[in-house]
Amino acid sequence: MLVNAPLSADTENEVRTKSEDVDPNVMADVLKAVIARVKKIDRDHDIPYIAGYSQNGEKIYIDRHMPKSAKLGGKRVQTDRFLILHEAVEKALLDELGLHYLHAHQIALRTERAAVEAEGHAWREYNAFTKAHERQIDDENLKKVPDDLDLTPYRNEKDFQKLQQMVAAIKSEE
């Protein structure tokens, strides 16, 4: 189980800021460490709810229509890393701790928010950006859904119509 994994020298080197308090520099280290563990980022598919992960957790999927950046506070900000953090945390909580999707999602969302705010961006502005695109993405006609996408979030949300569309899109790709 992941939570019993011993610390390695590499893991120790990822900690550049030593603080047990809420600290933006620690969150920057966390963001880099999590992203370094993701084996593949895929932006070639249609992914309802903006982003998701493969069943084995090795890939993070971001919808092909989701912009890679947003204008936040007047600055262009790359946003994929926040989505990757969210999805990686959510998947780890589902697989390693066996949490229900809604609980895993809440913790992942709060982690995403902490990362956004640690970089000095307003959560309200970032969240408005993601929600606006989530509505567009959810309304799209699904054509390219990966066959290894973990469907747990869609099953737990009881979004059966979306599940049917996804399964049909997967079958049409085969």
Spans of features found by a protein language model:
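Low-complexity, glycine/serine/proline-rich disordered segments
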Residues: 1-15
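Metalloprotease/metallohydrolase-associated module, dominated by Zn2+-dependent proteases
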Residues: 12-79, 95-174
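Active-site recognition of the HExxH zinc-binding catalytic motif
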Residues: 82-94
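Exposed, low-complexity/repetitive linear segments and helix-based recognition motifs
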Residues: 9, 84-87, 109
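Residue-level marker of positions within ordered structural domains that often coincide
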Residues: 1, 89, 113
